[in-house]
């Protein structure tokens, strides 16, 4: 029942997450509709504004554009427009309208009328409705007299419109409105405007009936028939001056709106490029002047829409009184509504809306005065160009003049991109939080007992959640790259590991489609490069993922070759080649465009995705200073389809690093059987580069014939891919190989399915594809035949040699020895430049002469010796007389002597065991007393299951000795009789299922592999010295105290074994019990808080969850946690402020550095700026949601020393308490 409830909880959480994503896409795709809705007409209130129609009660507005109610701010704008006119007469006459009415009223009306008309001039326009747009006043010569500030949102030459340039040069000529009209429409617009002036002269104001006028003689608005304008009349105002702007009706049947094409658009880099404009004649009636309302009909760019939308909907808006009406969209920057849809606001003095104020630097992450560095994908073309501290976001500079359209366009683009990034980043944070809850719940759910159907449902939920997370991350990365806010790291990394980890990550996806994955890195690849491995991995994953989507049969291969090598830099050429459908030539231009997918005509589009992978890859490669392109074979008819993505990037190298090691197998003859020619080519390239003689075969029957026809000495190792072969043929080959060639030729079986390799139970070594270089080398070493000329036969020969070796005689003189008839073979040794020196194998080119007779028993297996040494050959040998060869012989002799010492120690241990049996009774009594004392004092419990005791070790050594020196052994060692020189296998080769074979482990992802590598570095292997002076009752760990490690018990589990402990925190200590580590969790999201608590408690930690930072700080001293997981986004006091408060308290209390709390940031943000902010606040580490439990364990493992320090303090306090109790007793 509980399982079903939890499953229902998961499904409901995923449902709400999917709904959020759908709403997010609906919001992005319908932003144009959102802007249009924001510009809807604001209807007049019938109580305040009464509309009268002579014919009917319907408000017919067919001849008008979208109109808006004039508020006080718009009244001020019109008054300012007219008063700021350069025409002195116009300005005077307008003032006469405001004050001259009083004079007329004094002569014709009583004092009551004076009180009604002696009002603020804004009342003239109170009930008046105008067209939304930018206002212009022109005279009869069509010259611009005055303009509103909102004209700046349309035209780039605002200085010419306002007459600024004319005043500078001393000219008195006004700027003609016709200059703003495109050449083909100038005559039509000019005729239209002049006709309007002519019609204004024939207007008669006495045409309205007295019945329409209200008794109060105030301003009223009247709507009359179609094709007639809106008018406002004042019965008491009879001023007939022609220079006065009056309100009246135009009796002309001509429309008052005209559409045409204009020039000098703000968003056009080409000033002569036309754009659509609409001009409406406002009902200001004058003989000499006309007021025009202009509206830009050109489609606004997407970035402008995103900016407007984010300004209206962002929770971080500058003002809570923001308006979404069209009146604020054309704001000139002088109003108090700072949160409007206008790209300018009053808080920035007319500059575009920005998350920073005017005094901050440029929106570029490098500041405004810095040069364009490698972090910009656009190069120097988008560099900041301003010497002042103002943002380069407005077409006006600090002097009020207009910059060039191209410069202003780039500046606006930068600001709008940054604003849209803030919006998407906020949405990304809100989406990643529920996704984290889904993924964490899945991990907890999988730890319970589930049915097959439930596991299937969980897999679907897990896949959907990860796809959702990938989509959100891609959208955010795309916007950050395009805005230039993404920076690259420059760290040391291993290129080979990065590429092989990528292949391992996409291997399950390829295996689901029965595709092959392979990678080839050039042989002389340096071990170390400097660059950003995370972004390089992202590019490779995108390209490989694209190849897997469009490939149904075949393979996807990666290759890396050097293109240009400099002293401190190397240009590497990456190729990702697939065998898919290919890309047509006409679709190449659309390939790297964002939010697009290419469809090759008749090919069915089965691959789905956001269309951002290739666009992000292109930007990242350009950000690294490289280039990317694609070549395709889709148009060829030779059967070779598919495409290849190329990109070249420079990577810095370390000139002080050692030369790259090169494996040398001394002409080892290898038969490669693989039906896939591409995978076979990759294998052959590696083998030939490692000095192997390669024989190719594409059919297993052909391989069997070659084994029969060729001499046995000419084929030493067979590599066979069992994925693409017939099962019957493989069974026949297996039977023939076991009957004829077993023990003489090594066999490596390869498969993409690990379970298939294990079920076969056939072969000397097993290799899982996609293979790694280190795994391939290990399999070759393990599969070499016992007496191959390519192996280090010197090891086996040393055992049977006489005293010539002990006397350090020259090996070349062995040709005169009757027992050793050998010749020196001066070829490349399989061992070179290792810690064990160079070794030269001795053999004859025609006859392989072995030193051991049929009755000799080899005490050392060559293959096991090569594995135990842990060194792979690198450079060529210097010959049999080289000091390294002699040193190698001495090392082997020391190994033999050490083994003899082990045998003597075994005999001594047997004697000690007999003595121990006589003392058992005394020891039992002592143990009973000790157990009673331990129970009383709550001392340490014995946990012998997690440690190897001496008796068990001696038994294993007895078994090894028995296998090594049994009289019933034959010349050729069987699988169960192979002697081992090292008691513990190397972790890098994984778990060995058969003593005569090596089983290569392919990890699921790179994180597990990196964790294992960290464990290998910190692990001390079992050595013979650790067995000295240990008896059967010793409870101390034989690994030299590694049991004190917090995560020591998980090493065995990481490499494929089982661990007795179920959690990291429950790892036993050899000296004291493990104290549960206290962890405090701060998160305002109850779902995330509960899941985090469940994950940590399941691993044995003691958790203290808090949903409020104030409560957590108040109980901090009482709880005294070792680790604090801090959510950055919390109400009241956020995570940054809480961390600063904790650090301040620690400083005031003079807390030592080792005693400070470990604070780990827990947030859904993935921006580098947030990480820097976390570290600046005093946090120790950073983990981004959603995360997997393995990632959490890795974070905790990094702070193992601090946790151990707290554990030591706990142990000391426990010992002190026990001492006090004992003294009291």
Curated annotation (Swiss-Prot):
Membrane association type: Single-pass membrane protein
Catalytic activity annotation: ATP + protein L-histidine = ADP + protein N-phospho-L-histidine
TM stretches of this protein: 8-28
Record Pfam families: HATPase_c, HisKA, Response_reg
Residues with the 4-aspartylphosphate modification: 721, 1127
Compartments (UniProt record): Membrane
Biased composition (Low complexity): 313-356, 370-388, 1023-1037
Modified residues (Phosphohistidine): 429
Keyword Phosphoprotein assigned: yes
Top-level taxon of the source organism: Eukaryota
InterPro entries in the cross-refs: CheY-like_superfamily, HATPase_C_sf, His_kinase_dom, HisK_dim/P_dom, HisK_dim/P_sf, Sig_transdc_His_kin-like_C, Sig_transdc_resp-reg_receiver
Domain Histidine kinase: 426-653
Molecular function as annotated in GO: ATP binding; phosphorelay sensor kinase activity
Domain Response regulatory: 669-784, 1078-1200
Membrane keyword on record: yes
Region (Disordered): 313-407, 809-832, 941-974, 1021-1076
Annotated SUPFAM superfamilies: ATPase domain of HSP90 chaperone/DNA topoisomerase II/histidine kinase, beta-sandwich domain of Sec23/24, CheY-like, Homodimeric domain of signal transducing histidine kinase
Annotated function: Acts in a signal transduction pathway that regulates the slug versus culmination choice. Believed to be the first component of a phosphorelay that couples the sensing of ammonia to the modulation of PKA activity and hence activates culmination and spore germination. Ammonium transporters amtA and amtC are thought to respectively activate and inhibit dhkC phosphorelay. This protein probably undergoes an ATP-dependent autophosphorylation at conserved His residue in the kinase core, and a phosphoryl group is then transferred to a conserved aspartate residue in the receiver domain.
Name this protein carries in UniProt: Hybrid signal transduction histidine kinase C
Gene expressing this chain: dhkC
